[in-house]
Amino acid sequence: MRVLVISGLSGSGKSTAVRVLEDEGFFCIDNLPVQLFPTIIDLVNKAQETVPGVALVMDIRGRDFLKGFEKIFQEIDDAGHTIEIIFFDATDEVLIRRFSETRRRHPALESGSVPEGIRYEREQLSGLRRLATLVIDTSELNVHQLKEMVLARVKGEAGARRMTIHLQSFGYRYGIPLESDLVMDVRFLSNPHFVPELKPLSGLDPGVRNFVLEKPETTQFLARFEGLLEYLLPAYQREGKSYLTISIGCTGGRHRSVALVEELRRFFDRAGIAVKVSHRDMEKG
């Protein structure tokens, strides 16, 4: 099993890294005594549910448990697990500024200044830093760049910029989906609802699909909307967005929006982008 030990200075970005790992399916535990690492790893390894790995946070809050970690790590390695230590760091100036912005006291000292806390923390974690597989200096990174760097380490460069799309149809009659990032209203298209033989069918039916897609206005709309998506998706990815919900709506969510979502699915498939499709209101119309 792959084991990631997440460590580093307070305010350097560990919490952001853990959230990224949780999104990738890692089993994450914060502030666990190092002596319990082998037990947790063994339990997760024996569980029925498959996970890509375990991420364990180890920092100054567990100062009483920092001793003897090298022996524990060797025990984990001897058990056949791949252990990686990712250490997050930043300059003193940047850390001081971050603490000032959040108005938090430094967790390393009950009393004393933030600079004193940083110096003490560096000293306490120096041995762990020396063992690090990777040191990430976040001084010049924004949160999106940090997410990309963590993903690049976890999934490889090819996976760092992958985006998952949730493409869904809906009916305005039942309200706009609250989770939507992009909403497209296609009620301007000809409505199969008013064709007697098509009314009882859905947009999954070839007859309804042909009725909707063969109209010139549909062809023009798809060309423009797909062009917009080709522009927007890389921009969203540059900002660190890994999951995008696109909602396509018609009156009842049964005919036009369903047919268009299925056609857009093919667009994403051709582009090699992972897509999840759902039809929220198809059975209501």
Swiss-Prot record:
Annotated ATP binding lies at 8-15
Q: Which UniProt keywords apply?
A: ATP-binding, GTP-binding, Nucleotide-binding
Q: Where does GTP bind?
A: 59-62
As one GO molecular function, the record gives: ATP binding
Q: Which residues form a coiled coil?
A: none
Which NCBIfam families does the record cross-reference, listed alphabetically? PRK05416.1
Similarity remark: Belongs to the RapZ-like family.
HAMAP family found in the cross-reference section: RapZ_like
Which function does this protein serve? Displays ATPase and GTPase activities.
Q: What is this protein called?
A: Nucleotide-binding protein Gmet_1286
State the species of origin.
Geobacter metallireducens (strain ATCC 53774 / DSM 7210 / GS-15)
